[in-house]
């Protein structure tokens, strides 16, 4: 099987995945609304708090923005939330940049990890990217976010030298997934 055929098969598999809340049990991934901003702020804060000492203060502040900044980000591009029984338990956002969808702020609080929420969020974003004819997705993560890096690699992202090597003074790896 050629690389292109393999990628096409992978994308078809993603596109055939669960579409509704019931197919993912009691977890729904949906586009965020403005009134989700306070909960997204909490999820980001909870998700990155354990790494606070490893970030520069500027990077931590940028990774855990207040809801006013979250609302501005929602105007720049789509934001998704994973919701379970009315509670937001994960989030990711994206910025369109030409035919590339730049992902940012993927977060799942520690007590929610290990339940495939990250994968569910990535599947939702990949569907959006595929349906809107993006050619690739990119994401950056700091080296100490080993669980996230592993999740991205398992989802088909590959490390790339494209993009900045740091985020407000904190080192990052850049990753790309061709669609």
For each of these PLM feature ranges, what is it?
Residues 1-35:
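Conserved N-terminal entry element of GNAT/NAT acetyltransferase domains
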Residues 14, 31-37, 41-105, 109-111, ...:
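Acetyl-CoA-dependent GNAT
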Residues 19, 126, 149:
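Short glycine-/small-residue-rich flexible loop motifs, especially phosphate/cofactor-binding loops
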Residues 24, 74-75, 131, 154:
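Short, well-ordered coil/turn elements that cap or connect secondary structure elements
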Residues 71, 135-179:
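C-terminal "cap" of GNAT-fold acetyltransferases
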Residues 87, 109-123, 132, 143-150, ...:
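Conserved glycine-rich acetyl-CoA-binding loop
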